[in-house]
Design a protein with these regions (language model features):
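A short core secondary-structure module
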Residues: 156, 162-204
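A generic structural signal for well-ordered coil/turn residues at beta-strand boundaries
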Residues: 124, 140-142, 171-173, 186, ...
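Short, structured patches in soluble enzyme cores that scaffold and shape functional sites
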Residues: 130-132, 148, 163, 178-181, ...
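Glycine-rich beta->alpha junctions and the first turn(s) of the following alpha-helix
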Residues: 210-297
Length: 313
C-alpha cells in the first residue's frame, strides 16, 4: 500500500468521526466503550495501521507514517476522544513488532513470531496493560514475575503481578505487558490473549479496580491482579532495547494527537459560542480569549515540530 491508501482510511475515519460528533452529549456521559464503534473503525481500515505496507497494510516506517497516523487519531478525537485513545493503542503497540525485523539471539524464530503477530493484527485489536503501581509509567521498572510454563514451549509463560491503566480492557483481543524472568538481566515483552477472559480470578486475571471515569471517562482503563496468567514471551530478549526509541516517538505523537483533537474541539466550541459577541466583549474577556487562541496555536507549533522531527528521523 502507498500513501493514497492511508488517505483513503483517513477519509473513512472523517466520515465516522462526523457521525460520532452528532452524539457528543450522549457520548460524554458514557462510562464504557461500545463495540459497534470499533467495528466501524475496523471496516474503515484502521487495523491495518498494525500491518506493513508491503503486506497490504499502512505502516511505511516512522518517517513516512507519523503524519498519517497522527492525522487518523486526531480525526477520531474530533468525534470521540475516548474511542480515539483506545484505538491509538493498536498502532502504538504494534510498533514493537513492526519496528524491529532483525535480532541476533533468535533471528529466524523472531521473524516467524513477528509475522504471526502481524497476521493477528489484521483482524484483532491490540492494547497494553504495562503500567504498575510505583513504576511511574516506566514499563522497564516492572516487578511482575514471569515463570516458565510446563508445556515445553519456549515462549510459554505465566505472569504474576499488579497492572493498571489497561486502556481498552474488555475490548482489546490482545495486550502487551512486561515481566521479569528469574535470573534475567532485564524485563521481557510478553503478550496476553485477553479478550473474553473472566475477571473473577478463575483463570488468573482479577479485576482489582475498575476505571473511575476521571478524565477520559469511557476508556475502560482498569487495574488487574494477574496470578499465573498465561502469557507469550517474545522470542528475542533484544526487543525492548532495540525498539523502545521508536515506540517512544510514535506513542508520544499518537497520544499528543488525541490531545490536539480535543483542543480542536474546544476551540471550535468556543468560537461558536462567541459568534456575534466578540465586539461587545470587555477588555479582560478579549485578553483571555486571545490567550486561549495563542496557547492552542503554540501547542500546534510544538506538535508540528515533533511530527517533522519524526519525519526526518
Amino acid at each position: 500500500m502507498n500513501r493514497e491508501n492511508s488517505q483513503s482510511v483517513i477519509e473513512n475515519l472523517q466520515a465516522i468521526s462526523a457521525t460520532f460528533a452528532k452524539d457528543t452529549a450522549e457520548r460524554q456521559t458514557r462510562r464504557e466503550l461500545d463495540p459497534a464503534d470499533f467495528e466501524q473503525l475496523a471496516e474503515a481500515g484502521f487495523l491495518l495501521t498494525g500491518v506493513p505496507a508491503e503486506q497490504g497494510g499502512l505502516w511505511r516506517g516512522i518517517a513516512e507514517s507519523a503524519r498519517d497516523y497522527t492525522t487518523m487519531v486526531r480525526t477520531l478525537a474530533h468525534g470521540d476522544p475516548c474511542v480515539a485513545l483506545v484505538a491509538t493503542m493498536h498502532p502504538a503497540v504494534m510498533v514493537y513488532f513492526l519496528g524491529c525485523e532483525q535480532v541476533n539471539d533468535a533471528p529466524q524464530a523472531w521473524l516467524a513470531q513477528r509475522q504471526s503477530v502481524i497476521e493477528l493484527a489484521r483482524n484483532h485489536w491490540w492494547g497494553t496493560v504495562t503500567s504498575e503501581p510505583g513504576s511511574g509509567g516506566d514499563m522497564l521498572k516492572t516487578k511482575t514475575a514471569a515463570k516458565k510454563s510446563a508445556d515445553g514451549i519456549d515462549t510459554s509463560y505465566t505472569i504474576s503481578g499488579n497492572k493498571h491503566f489497561g486502556s481498552g480492557s474488555g475490548h482489546a483481543d490482545y495486550m502487551i505487558t512486561t515481566a521479569r524472568r528469574k535470573g534475567a538481566e532485564g524485563p521481557d515483552l510478553f503478550y496476553l490473549k485477553i479478550k473474553d477472559e473472566p475477571w473473577d480470578g478463575s483463570t488468573g486475571c482479577t479485576l482489582a479496580s475498575a476505571w473511575d471515569g476521571i478524565g477520559m471517562t469511557a476508556t475502560q482503563s482498569h487495574a488487574f491482579r494477574f496470578e499465573n496468567f498465561p502469557a507469550t514471551k517474545t522470542i528475542t530478549s533484544e526487543l525492548l532495547g532495540k525498539v523502545s526509541p521508536i515506540t517512544a516517538v510514535i506513542g508520544n505523537l499518537l497520544f499528543a494527537a488525541v490531545a490536539m483533537g480535543i483542543a480542536d474541539n474546544a476551540l471550535s466550541f468556543a468560537k461558536d459560542k462567541l459568534k456575534g459577541k466578540l465586539q461587545n466583549m470587555r477588555a479582560y474577556e478579549r485578553v483571555e480569549w486571545n490567550r486561549c487562541r495563542n496557547e492552542i496555536w503554540l501547542a500546534q507549533q510544538a506538535f508540528d515540530g515533533a511530527v517533522r522531527a519524526a519525519e526526518a528521523s
